[in-house]
Amino acid sequence: MALWGGRFQGETSALFKLFNDSLPVDYRLFEQDVVGSIAWADAIASVGIITATECSDLKKALNDLLVEVNGDPAIILASGAEDIHSFVESALIAKVGDLGKKLHTGRSRNDQVATDLKLWCQSEGAALLARLHSLHAELLALAEREFDAVMPGYTHLQRAQPVTFGHWCLAYVEMYERDISRLADALTRANTCPLGSGALAGTAYKMDRHALAAALNFAAPTLNSLDSVSDRDHVVELCSTASISMMHLSRMAEDLIFFNSGEANFISLSDEVTSGSSLMPQKKNPDALELIRGKTGRVYGSLVGILTTMKALPLAYNKDMQEDKEGLFDVVDSWAICLDMAALVLSGLKVNRPNALLAAQQGYANSTELADYLVSKGMPFREAHHVVGEVVVAAIAKQIPLEDFSLAELKTFAAIIEDDVYPNLTIEACLAKRDVLGGTALPQIQQAIAAKKAR
């Protein structure tokens, strides 16, 4: 049953119905639509539109419908309704007759869908927060297990300075903590109830919208009816928050894909999250990580989609806004499975310590320590930087590490170099000198892990 038929004399085109109907997408708002309708029944009862008995009958029928559909969700799509609101209203009328036709009094699908969508975002957002916390905990546990595993740190994908795997883990811990904060903030801003805003000008019935908001567990009602039905900031912000988090997931995936490559071989991934080749029997591919990286693009696409949809819409509601849900649902689904998969990857990850250490000892990653040593002897840093560059060129020509030069050879580059240079060139010294807040020295890593676990 269409909710708007009286104005029209001709039949709706079958093609237009297929084009216009949103039930194949917005069926996911069923529970929120029922919950909102139950609260609305109480609201219209409070202003005398229906009696207490009628309100009770409506609420019972709505709760019965909730149970029925949860038992057989296929009922919704089989109905052929235009949208989820039409389905709920038609099913309600089938249960209670003309009483069901009273429920929509004072309400528009505009404030109805805005409320449904915010309820859905609050529910799914809470589940996403839990997933982010789980990933954060898994990464912190990995940092604790491998806090002292030495590996090369990179800039420009070139070996730069030695770090620990624990330090690498904590870098992403910081990123996911910001994701948690962003999502929590977004949910706080979305925690207002549009119900009672009507089509655009507000409902004609003087109900208590504060009580209505509280009944639906919102922090407060919205304050402007035009904004209430036009606003999709919460959709944009959730997609934006997801996009930033997916960027972090994708960067982590890229790091791990490289660390897992035969060329690096710093880590091993569990069989649980890898697959093989149909042709090459030796292959063990990091498909979970590659899919995380790949799904990031579709999340970005949905963000751009909703921004483009909303960018030129006049107030208030426009049918364009029906396009807000498909991208949002896909964003939430993609983000959720990627968070779960990333946590699973980390839970079975093993660091190949000898390989990672060997790589850290190569590539002249201790060059900065030699420059710092020269500075400690009184040489200006810029001059020390130049001298060490010359030492590296000579070392490459001889195919030896810096520490294999004899003292006499080193003195040809800088006469101030003495025997005490060699302890400064060890991996242990490179790490130990970074004993500053945020640094890669082992005490700093341990303190950072302990502080985060204590929260």
From Swiss-Prot:
It is found in: Cytoplasm. GO terms for cellular component: cytosol. Its EC number is 4.3.2.1. The keyword Lyase applies. SUPFAM superfamilies: L-aspartase-like (SSF48557). Its main location: cytoplasm. GO terms for molecular function: argininosuccinate lyase activity. Keywords: Amino-acid biosynthesis, Arginine biosynthesis, Cytoplasm, Lyase. It comes from the Bacteria. The keyword Cytoplasm applies. It is an enzyme of class 4 (lyase). Transmembrane segments: none annotated. One of its GO terms (biological process) is arginine biosynthetic process via ornithine. Pfam families: ASL_C2, Lyase_1. Pathway: Amino-acid biosynthesis; L-arginine biosynthesis; L-arginine from L-ornithine and carbamoyl phosphate: step 3/3. It catalyses: 2-(N(omega)-L-arginino)succinate = fumarate + L-arginine. PANTHER family: ARGININOSUCCINATE LYASE. Belongs to the lyase 1 family. Argininosuccinate lyase subfamily. HAMAP family: Arg_succ_lyase. This is Argininosuccinate lyase. The gene is argH.
